[in-house]
Amino acid sequence: MLQEKESIKQANEFAIERVFNAPRHLVWKAFAEAERLAQWWGPAGFKMEVKKLELSPGGTFHYSMQSSDGFIMWGKFVYLQIVEPEKIVFILSFSDENGAITRAPMSATWPLEVFNVLTFKEHDGKTTVTLKGHPVNATEEEIETFRNEFEGMNQGFSSTFDQLDEYLAKLLFDHS
């Protein structure tokens, strides 16, 4: 039964990995400090604002992203585990401006909560960031919606990681 549950979880798990040409401590700071996150988090073309960032178990990252046409989306992480500089475990949700969990603006059947694990591994001065996520407390319909959006999530996180790549390159250039 446990093995069956594990294989179901894996089938419903989104994963993306990126190697950044920067040391792990800098990549970690880009995820851990509000002023750094505001420089790169979210899709290209969106203006990011950090309302709150408390990187500790039970803490939150509450933010908004505004598109060029003025559309605003709110999101929230609730941190479950922080192992600096190796791992961040959190629940990701769409939210309103007060931090209350809401439905995704693009889908009425998107899961309300997505469990995520971010890992940071350094090798030869480069850092591999791996993100894995799966719905929690979700209906079958929400799980199916999540699974059907793997390609879109891959594009979205690739764009976000492109911005992180640019941010880190600028940071390293400015300090060289």
Per-range role (PLM):
Residues 1-47, 163:
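Hydrophobic ligand-binding cavity/cleft-lining segments
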Residues 11-17, 24, 60, 74, ...:
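Intrinsic-disorder/low-complexity, polar/charged segments enriched in Ser/Thr/Lys/Arg/Asp/Glu/Gln
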Residues 15, 35-78, 175-176:
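Short beta-edge strand/loop motif at the mouth of beta-sheet-based domains
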Residues 20, 65-67, 94, 133-135:
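Short beta-strand segments enriched in hydrophobic/aromatic residues
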Residues 27, 37, 61, 79, ...:
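Hydrophobic pocket/interface hotspot
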Residues 51-55, 62, 69-124:
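Hydrophobic-ligand binding "helix-grip"
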Residues 100-155:
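Beta-strand/loop substructures that line and gate deep hydrophobic ligand-binding cavities in soluble
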Residues 166-176:
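Short, highly charged C-terminal tails/helix-capping segments
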